[in-house]
């Protein structure tokens, strides 16, 4: 009997597992040999590239990538250091010390992670009071938290052994536990008498856009009353993620005038001017100098994408430069020769491509027009006596005049003319297309140095082999893919996505079916394109069923004699209808997950609505 009761006991874990709506399967991955080198590059030159050259390409890419990112990391670290220094200068400027008003700092584009560092002064106690939207439901709670943080920070300096914990809004016993802390401005009024120092309070309001503006307004007015105490100085820092006009619109005008008596604005979104963007682009030019060129099409692509993005320009710029470097090394067999030492690997497979380069052919055409010796021309075309090979090596060790002149102009503008509000990327683009003079006309100080700054763009031989470009749109599709168009194109032209059917030992029956019928999603999508905006689900199914190859499908489900369930299904008169319905339901639910259709918000499921369609 006890065994029977034991068997009837519910297994709680099994019961809980049975209530799950879905299951996650983690397939086991094959263990890789640690000694094996996994290089994510493929052999180029129609598969004729040696493994040594593939490895060399990977090593060169890794070197340039590491060098570039080391410089970017250094620039990003400097941004935070520069920002801290700017905020500190504003908090402790001499004009701020003398005026009896708020010292207001608006941090524009802030994600509220900016760290505020205060100085240690012998005659004044500096305290940082940070308030989040959660800590600011009303004026009483804001004041309560502020005074507690002020008292605990000041008392901790007087008595370092005492530890203070952050207060909890839901702690009802907090007031009883801390009766010595008064939740009005009496602590501020008596601060010098209690601690023997002047007081400088810095309020850091985080995520201001989410704080109740009426509460914030009243709290600022309350703090204003502290100006009657000579020993008190108050600074207000507002972390604004949207824009200043949003704050001005929601606070009272009298409060705005009070804040703007002494205020400063800082753009902390890392997009301030062109300073840091110029530094990152300059570091990239330094990384590829003497190795790679940048095409005007590629630089124009960078400018256009950055113009459409105002919040994360530095991250976007780094991403585009990084990806362009990777794609170049991945698809260009000649990238191995950016290190002239590797010229020993130059063979006929490379030389055939060299002789067909447009810039090289143009150069040879010029030699013919100049009536150069026939032997010299033939040695270049046929590599007779290693003529083409030596000519290519000579090209590799030449300096890039474009990058050098771009650095010269940028340095001249900053050091000689004190001009810093220029976009180095735009300057470089104008340099490439021969419009540098017109770009520099926007600064009158450049007019008398036009001859010195002028540059005539030149084409270098074999430049197409060593140039970062966006000719095929690879960067555009990889970094900014058109998801909708890609999905639709892949559903329509599935042959370009799935593996080729022309394989040895391919199952004849499966192959015949695949050649006649597209994948289920592609098969249904053809009908989807032709359907109206609102689709009757039954009519949709009937149309789908009629497009399926009936005989091939029935032959396919009969092909495995060991699968008795499929054989039984094949013998039923409505076998094809059942299979068609299963395929249709799979495709319909896949379309819903992909966002192509949605069921109408009614109890009837007879109709579905198209979410994406072409031509409208």
UniProtKB/Swiss-Prot annotation:
Keyword Transcription in annotation: no
Keywords per UniProt: Acetylation, DNA replication, DNA-binding, Nucleus
GO MF annotation list: chromatin binding; DNA replication origin binding
A Pfam family the protein falls into: ORC3_N
Protein's GO biological process: DNA replication initiation; pre-replicative complex assembly involved in nuclear cell cycle DNA replication; silent mating-type cassette heterochromatin formation
Record function comment: Component of the origin recognition complex (ORC) that binds origins of replication. It has a role in both chromosomal replication and mating type transcriptional silencing. Binds to the ARS consensus sequence (ACS) of origins of replication.
Protein name per UniProt: Origin recognition complex subunit 3
GO CC, alphabetical: DNA replication preinitiation complex; nuclear origin of replication recognition complex; nuclear pre-replicative complex; nucleoplasm; nucleus
The gene coding this protein: ORC3
Keyword Cell membrane: no
Superkingdom classification of source: Eukaryota
Residue list for modification N-acetylserine: 2
Taxonomic source organism: Saccharomyces cerevisiae (strain ATCC 204508 / S288c)
Record-linked InterPro entries: EF_Hand_1_Ca_BS, ORC3, ORC3_N, ORC_WH_C
